């Protein structure tokens, strides 16, 4: 079955590639989150991809030295966010505005999740990086309608973003109410 709407994760560990496809393309050394751009460039070269909805590999997240277990840290902002921006620029450079907007939509969702998660960080880190996220989203405000009109977008996510842009404090309060009260009630109702 051919399916253009399957969202493929950036991770390199869950893919097999033909060597010829890689050509001269290599992972950059000394960079974290390098698979975000690398995987996108590699998939853009491919004439055919096959997706198996089958677990054939057991990835260990808590591996010593793995950045997957680091949680929120400065690398997210110094390496990961720039990698997402580079990925989007690449998608636009090859004429895939549609995919660039889908990517941006998921990027915005991720930034809102980071904003919430930063609540558990040390005060100086929390304030610094929440400010970075807030400024980025306010800067992008003019592009929100286009991005949230992409094929992958959920209208509820746009509402969350609108609340955040009006007041990050209100956004956090709404999320807390949702997590503490609304989600548990919905889960109980589904069980009955």
What are these language model-derived features?
Residues 1-52, 57-75:
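Donor-binding/catalytic cores of nucleotide-activated saccharide
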Residues 28-40, 80-85, 170-174:
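Short charge-dense sequence patches
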Residues 50-52, 102, 145-147:
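General small-molecule cofactor/ligand-binding pocket signal
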Residues 56-63, 69-98, 110-113, 117-144:
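Catalytic core of nucleotide-sugar-dependent glycosyltransferases
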Residues 98-106:
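All-alpha amphipathic helical-bundle segments outside canonical DNA-binding/catalytic cores
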Residues 120-192:
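Membrane-interface aromatic/basic loop that binds lipid-linked glycans or pyrophosphate carriers
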């Amino acid at each position: 079955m051919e399916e253009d709407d399957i969202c493929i994760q950036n991770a390199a560990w869950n893919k097999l590639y033909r060597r010829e496809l890689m050509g001269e393309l290599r992972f950059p050394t000394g960079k974290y989150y390098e698979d975000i751009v690398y995987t996108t460039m590699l998939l853009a070269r491919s004439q055919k991809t096959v997706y198996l909805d089958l677990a054939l590999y057991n990835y260990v997240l808590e591996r010593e030295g793995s950045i997957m277990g680091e949680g929120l840290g400065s690398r997210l902002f110094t390496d990961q966010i720039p990698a997402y921006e580079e990925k989007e620029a690449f998608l636009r450079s090859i004429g895939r505005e549609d995919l660039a907007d889908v990517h941006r939509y998921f990027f915005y969702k991720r930034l809102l999740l980071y904003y919430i998660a930063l609540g558990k960080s040390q005060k100086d880190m929390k304030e610094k990086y929440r400010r970075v996220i807030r400024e980025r989203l306010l800067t992008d405000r003019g592009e929100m309608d286009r991005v949230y009109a992409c094929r992958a977008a959920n209208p509820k996510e746009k509402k969350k973003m609108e609340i955040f842009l009006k007041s990050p404090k209100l956004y956090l309060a709404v999320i807390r109410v949702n997590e503490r009260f609304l989600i548990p009630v919905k889960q109980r109702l589904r069980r009955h």
